[in-house]
């Protein structure tokens, strides 16, 4: 089995998880982030189109987990957890 990716959560994403999202959504997003996302980030999400091509997006109901993958350092940086209507603005 391959080694898991290291997790980095941006200050914005941390604030969204702890203060802005409904508790049930924040819990589900966090479980996803520390589980399947760190196991295989390329498989659980899709690469975004320009100008956001350095990011990936994974669906969690009507919310999106937006993240960057650094394959060299095996690091996933979560940059946001937002409702899909606001995710790509």
Feature names for model-found ranges:
Residues 82:
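Residues forming the ATP-binding cleft of Hanks-type serine/threonine protein kinase domains
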Residues 1-59, 71-77, 85-89:
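Basic, Lys/Arg-enriched alpha-helical interface segments
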Residues 62:
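Glycine-rich phosphate-binding loop
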């Amino acid at each position: 089995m391959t080694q898991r990716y290291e997790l980095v959560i941006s200050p914005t994403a941390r604030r969204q998880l702890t203060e802005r999202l409904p508790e049930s959504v924040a819990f589900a997003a966090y479980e996803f982030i520390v589980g399947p996302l760190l196991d295989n980030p390329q498989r659980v999400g899709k690469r975004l189109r320009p100008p956001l091509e350095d990011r990936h997006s994974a669906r969690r109901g009507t919310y999106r987990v937006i993240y960057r993958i650094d394959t060299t350092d095996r690091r996933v940086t979560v940059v946001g957890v937002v409702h899909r209507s606001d995710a790509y603005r």
